[in-house]
Amino acid sequence: GSAIGPVDRVVSSPLRRVLQTAEAFGRPVVVDDRWIELDFGSLEGTPVTAVPAATWEAWRNDLGWAPSGGESHRQLGERVRPACEELSEVAGVEDVVVVSHVSPIKAALAWSLGVGEEIVWRCHLATGSVTVIAIGAFGPVLRGFNDVSHLGERR
């Protein structure tokens, strides 16, 4: 929690490794399934280097494309945007931390910048990094992205 400061509410993906991080804030954790990682379907567990080039091309060129049994980036954005909107309603009243995964955080980034999901292919997000989205008088403002300074030597 020291990399972020005091928080009023902690929201987390239901996956165990993320919940463990969320619990480190010492606050009750609200589990919200909308913050779970993108469903990679038939590609789940496949090393990035083993994914065929044609698959990458299809994925990058069509935000509606999804691996068999999985979820598209468009679907992910449709899932994450309402969660962002709900959290923005408590801005100014509560400081909220969301502990999630790379893809949903990138979807939240797209929401905050008012751009489409194509941004997911144009930014890198490190595991354990901190991204800060503040809600100002005119809506969401990206205040920090992919900060890993708190990880020190562990990075």
Region locations from a protein language model:
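Short beta-strand scaffold positions
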Residues: S12-S13, E78, V99-S100
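Acidic, low-complexity terminal tails and accessory targeting/binding regions
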Residues: V31, L38-A50, E89-E94, W111-R155
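Short glycine/proline- and acidic residue-enriched helix-loop micro-motifs
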Residues: T55-Q75
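Alpha-helix N-cap/helix-start capping motif
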Residues: L15-L19, V102-S103, T127
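Amphipathic, non-transmembrane alpha-helical scaffold segments
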Residues: L15, H73, G77-R81
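A glycine-rich beta-strand to alpha-helix segment
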Residues: A91-A108
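Active-site signature of alpha/beta-hydrolase-fold catalytic machinery across serine-
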Residues: A24, A107-W111
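Phosphate-coordination/substrate-recognition cap region in phosphate-metabolizing enzymes
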Residues: G1-E57
